[in-house]
Amino acid sequence: MFAKLENLERRFEDLEQQLASSEVFNDQDRYRKLTKAHADLKEVVDVFRRYKELRQNLADNKELLDDADPEIRSMAHEEAKSLESAIPEIEQELQLLLLPKDPLDEKNTIVEIRAGTGGEEAALFAADLFRMYSRYAEIRGWKVEILSANESDTGGYKEVIALIVGDKVYSRLKFESGTHRVQRVPATESQGRIHTSAATVAILPEAEEVDVEIRPDDIRIDVFRASGAGGQHVNKTESAVRITHMPSGIVVSCQDEKSQHKNKAKAMKVLASRLLQAEQDRQHNEMAADRRSQVGSGDRSERIRTYNFPQGRVTDHRINLTLYSLDRVMEGEAQALFDALSTHAQTEALKAQADVQ
């Protein structure tokens, strides 16, 4: 591990020298690539340098343990104990930083939320989930754009699809795929009985042209009139678009825009991301056919989390985590929840790496 870290530090220093060159600065394409490579290495190099500094301080303190002055020996002993306890933590941090990066982590994300069992209450819960992710995105400084929405009669969502754009969106949201269950008393419930309903969430990395090739011969495009809640026509022209990808059977519809061209562009964006996710799932299943991911498969049918409003708790069943801060989570303050999922995934990756070695 440490030989690899030394190589990374040398690479980092080489990049710093190149970035200081006027020749590189004048070549903006090269400058951008080197800047990104430099940024990718900075965290691990900074931690490695801190680790080496701790090691050096520990060696210096151990020399003072033989000092003639008992007070200096005592101080050196206490300092050495403190340094020895800090070093294993830094070593684990370095191990985590050296784990292979998910190439999709940097991507923007398409979030698909669909009401499940529970009728109108499920549609209202789907809207609550969309608001939670939107508020979280706002807190993170990300941008949310609705690509498609099918509203229910009570103001919920039968389905809503949105694009979230920002820094490392997929890395933070990728564990959200699955079935989310809610337990609460609906506003229409006169007896005060708790109802259970559900919504499914799918998290897809936004596909770029280089990621997915969609051949024109592989798709069928149908146009139709857009309709709103209750089935009433909201557009007299055939602006809504339905795209069918015939090889995979994936169907995407979009009717939010008045322009057929804009609806087609949005539907193509969703289709490309679904195809990319399908390919990633296929590769994942091939590589991990003999073991199931401990954070969950991301299968939409998998119940991953329960939101219990009477008790004010949210429970993630994959990692046995319960937080009694449901109100804050629903307002987008979900950092602790997402951090716990990310940490668990990293821990499992370290275990898997140790098993291979």
UniProtKB/Swiss-Prot annotation:
GO cellular component, alphabetical, reads: cytoplasm
Q: Which residues carry this modification: N5-methylglutamine?
A: 232
Task: Tell me one Pfam family matched here.
Answer: RF-1
**Top-rank taxon:** Bacteria
State the InterPro entries in the record: PCRF, Pep_chain_release_fac_I, Pep_chain_release_fac_I_sf, Prokaryotic/Mito_RF, RF-1
Determine if Calcium is one of this entry's keywords: no
- Where is this chain's protein located in or outside the cell? Cytoplasm
Q: Residue ranges of region Disordered?
A: 281-309
The Basic and acidic residues compositionally biased stretches are 281-305
Q: What is its main location?
A: cytoplasm
PTM notes: Methylated by PrmC. Methylation increases the termination efficiency of RF1.
Show the SUPFAM superfamilies listed in the entry.
Answer: Release factor
What GO terms are given for molecular function?
translation release factor activity, codon specific
- UniProt keyword terms in alphabetical order: Cytoplasm, Methylation, Protein biosynthesis
The record's section on NCBIfam families has: prfA, PRK00591.1
> Record's family?
Belongs to the prokaryotic/mitochondrial release factor family.
> What does this gene product do?
Peptide chain release factor 1 directs the termination of translation in response to the peptide chain termination codons UAG and UAA.
Name this polypeptide is given = Peptide chain release factor 1
Q: Look up and give the organism this protein is from.
A: Nitratidesulfovibrio vulgaris (strain DSM 19637 / Miyazaki F)
Q: Which gene encodes it?
A: prfA
